[in-house]
């Protein structure tokens, strides 16, 4: 622990598993106070307890697509830990279908979480953190799928590409208005998560050098450490940028 995030107060959506949990863990390790969110209370409470006590981390049940719930989430976080300085919009879902085969219901559900949820968190984050001298940072989780197309991820591609460009717009607006709020995107490649563990042969397939030139997939902490940097004052001149962590996938 080096206290890189001492004095920071962060909200991490989808923070109960995988990448989100790793981000929350590293944030606390580096001195931040954190609220993680998720849809399932039992999973969320267990996740928070695995990281630390209620003096440093708490769980709030919240669906990122619930617009009204965002204000309550900020209020609850600030009552517990003080002014929010950092928002990590990490919550997301996937539908493995082509554009042709994706139903309207599937399309709207995915975008409600992956895009609307990020929009709600970004908008309210700006409104609540601007002009306060907090060194505020909004970190929006996109994906390598925000850069390249995948024939079986039509809706997911759309959502992650939209997050990438929307974040640039927000970053420019905040910079030009001297809000002291930075907005950046993180683009994971293939990462070892519970979902990957549950899919037989998935890790081996993703580790092929034609997909990941480094020959192995990443770990959640590979993404978490990038987020620590972006949440810290070390990244005070970084905004509107894309941070790709993919073992060389998009360099091909």
Curated annotation (Swiss-Prot):
Reactions it catalyzes: a secondary alcohol + NADP(+) = a ketone + NADPH + H(+); acetophenone + NADPH + H(+) = (R)-1-phenylethanol + NADP(+); 2,5-hexanedione + 2 NADPH + 2 H(+) = (2R,5R)-hexanediol + 2 NADP(+); ethyl 3-oxobutanoate + NADPH + H(+) = ethyl (R)-3-hydroxybutanoate + NADP(+)
Record's protein name: NADP-dependent (R)-specific alcohol dehydrogenase
Practical uses of the protein: Because of its broad substrate specificity and its ability to produce chiral alcohols with high enantiomeric excesses, this protein from L.kefiri is a very interesting enzyme for preparative applications in the synthesis of pharmaceuticals and agrochemicals.
Positions contributing to Mg(2+) binding: 252
Matching PANTHER family: DEHYDROGENASES, SHORT CHAIN, ESTRADIOL 17-BETA-DEHYDROGENASE 8-RELATED
Keywords: Magnesium, Metal-binding, NADP, Nucleotide-binding, Oxidoreductase
Example GO molecular function: oxidoreductase activity
Active site location: 156
Functional summary from the UniProt entry: NADP-dependent (R)-specific alcohol dehydrogenase (ADH) with a broad substrate specificity, able to catalyze in vitro the stereoselective reduction of several aliphatic and aromatic ketones as well as beta-keto esters to the corresponding enantiomerically pure alcohols.
Leading EC class: oxidoreductase
Chain sites annotated for binding NADP(+): 16-19, 39-40, 63-64, 90, 156, 160, 191-195
Gene3D superfamilies according to UniProt: NAD(P)-binding Rossmann-like Domain
Subunit-level organization: Homotetramer.
Family label: Belongs to the short-chain dehydrogenases/reductases (SDR) family.
Temperature-related behavior of activity: Optimum temperature is 50 degrees Celsius with acetophenone as substrate.
């Amino acid at each position: 622990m080096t206290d890189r995030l001492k004095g920071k107060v962060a909200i991490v959506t989808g923070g109960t598993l995988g990448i989100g949990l790793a981000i929350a863990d590293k944030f606390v390790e580096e001195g931040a106070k954190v609220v993680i969110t998720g849809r399932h209370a039992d999973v969320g409470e267990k996740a928070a307890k695995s990281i630390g006590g209620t003096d440093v981390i708490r769980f709030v049940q919240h669906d990122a697509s619930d617009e009204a719930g965002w204000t309550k989430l900020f209020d609850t976080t600030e009552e517990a830990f003080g002014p929010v300085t950092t928002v990590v919009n990490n919550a997301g879902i996937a539908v493995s279908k082509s554009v042709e085969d994706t139903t309207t219901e599937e399309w709207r559900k995915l975008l409600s979480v992956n895009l609307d949820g990020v929009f709600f968190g970004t908008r309210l984050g700006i409104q609540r953190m601007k002009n306060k001298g907090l060194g505020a940072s909004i970190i929006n989780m996109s994906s390598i799928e925000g850069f390249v197309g995948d024939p079986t991820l039509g809706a997911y591609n759309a959502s992650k590409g939209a997050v990438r460009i929307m974040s640039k717009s927000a970053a420019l607006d905040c910079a030009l208005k001297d809000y002291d709020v930075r907005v950046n995107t993180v683009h994971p490649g293939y990462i070892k998560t519970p979902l990957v563990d549950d899919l037989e042969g998935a890790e081996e397939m993703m580790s092929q050098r034609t997909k990941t030139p480094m020959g192995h997939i990443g770990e959640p902490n590979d993404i978490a450490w990038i987020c620590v940097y972006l949440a810290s004052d070390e990244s005070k001149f970084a905004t509107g940028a894309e941070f790709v962590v993919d073992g060389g996938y998009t360099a091909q």
